[in-house]
């Protein structure tokens, strides 16, 4: 499917990156759910190119299924919950094809109203799509019938060629906002709590970003927005993967550049961003950056950075044999705050096999034995 800045860390791709060779932690990956029968049991055919995720605290984890226009729900054990939500296509379009949801947020406020007929209610979950739309859901206006519901389209920029790849929620002195990465236009779009487009004090710009790179993923960490950049293809609707093809910048929720966080090196079309908990092995409390890039060196790796003022590269998540964990088509990385999840476990979604399939899994930290450390 298709600026008072501090100098960030530029990662070399060679032997200088051996900071993680002496790993103290083995990271163990477990796949929980997939649409592939031979990968995980039980199989879920709806989980196709599992992309963005969101949840209310303690509620199920909602997953955007990019290949079939759905959002499906799971607990921390991978057990599917009894609701499936369809994401609508742009106005005037009909299936097939289906919509292509990407980013998603949970709305903790009473804003972002959805109106259907005479009924109005605040959005609970909000999605953006590669179709150039934003959709929102609340069962008051989007009724559930036999375990299924359909979200309501609230923004439609499909006729402008918008291609949204990520979505974040944030607050600043002006109020509550949505931040959508428009990969085709190379910008971060901003919407207020009535889904109206807005311009903030900053414009999410950094003159150091080379031409041909565009905002890809976006995550709110400690009320700062981490924006990842990937290289555009000729059509500007998808990424060109490859070692060193990526940047990460940090902005305020006003769109003002704070710092250049990471550049090139082990980045390969980075999308997912998460802050590790204090109990995640040697990379506790670090900022984790996940590579979506499906080809080239570092494809599907998860890299750790100090997250302080120095943005030091700390290493990559590795298994008990010291091999980097590589997840084909890696998208979201989040720690457990949802139903039956563990707070110190890293959960992930992915679209393996060129985004044709879907995967939801988890990674836990375990101390490495002395024998393992010598391998």
Question: What function would you assign to each model-found segment?
Answer:
Residues 2-12:
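Bacterial N-terminal signal peptides
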Residues 17-375:
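Sequence/structural signature of beta-propeller domains
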């Amino acid at each position: 499917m298709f600026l008072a800045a501090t100098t960030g860390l530029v990662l070399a791709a060679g032997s200088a990156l051996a900071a993680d060779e002496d790993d103290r932690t083995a990271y163990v990956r477990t796949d929980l759910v997939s649409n592939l029968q031979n990968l995980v049991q039980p199989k879920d055919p709806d989980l196709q190119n599992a992309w963005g995720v969101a949840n209310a605290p303690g509620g199920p984890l909602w997953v955007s299924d990019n290949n079939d226009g759905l959002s499906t729900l799971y607990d921390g054990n991978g057990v599917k919950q009894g609701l499936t939500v369809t994401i609508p296509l742009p106005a005037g379009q009909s299936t097939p094809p289906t919509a292509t949801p990407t980013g998603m947020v949970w709305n903790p406020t009473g804003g972002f109203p959805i109106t259907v007929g005479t009924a109005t209610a605040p959005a609970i979950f909000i999605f953006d799509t590669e179709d150039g739309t934003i959709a929102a859901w609340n069962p008051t206006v989007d009724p559930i019938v036999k375990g299924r519901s359909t979200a309501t389209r609230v923004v439609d920029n499909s006729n402008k060629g918008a291609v949204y790849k990520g979505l974040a929620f944030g607050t600043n002195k002006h109020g509550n906002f949505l931040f959508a990465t428009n990969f085709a236009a190379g910008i971060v779009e901003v919407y207020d709590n009535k889904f109206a487009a807005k311009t903030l004090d900053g414009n999410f710009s950094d003159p150091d970003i080379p031409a041909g790179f565009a905002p890809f993923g976006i995550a709110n960490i400690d009320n700062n927005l981490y924006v990842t950049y990937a290289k555009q293809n000729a059509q500007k609707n998808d990424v060109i993967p490859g070692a060193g093809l990526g940047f990460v910048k940090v902005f305020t929720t006003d769109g003002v550049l704070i710092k250049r966080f990471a550049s090139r090196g082990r980045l390969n079309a980075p999308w997912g961003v998460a802050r590790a908990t204090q109990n995640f092995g040697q990379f506790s409390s670090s900022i984790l950056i996940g590579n979506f890039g499906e080809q080239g060196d570092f494809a599907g790796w998860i890299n750790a950075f100090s997250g302080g003022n120095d943005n030091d590269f700390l290493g990559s998540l590795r298994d008990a044999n010291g091999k980097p964990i590589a997840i084909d088509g890696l998208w979201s990385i989040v720690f457990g705050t949802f139903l039956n999840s563990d707070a110190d476990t890293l959960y992930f979604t992915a679209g393996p096999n060129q985004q044709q399939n879907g995967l939801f899994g988890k990674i836990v930290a375990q101390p490495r034995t002395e024998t393992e450390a010598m391998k």
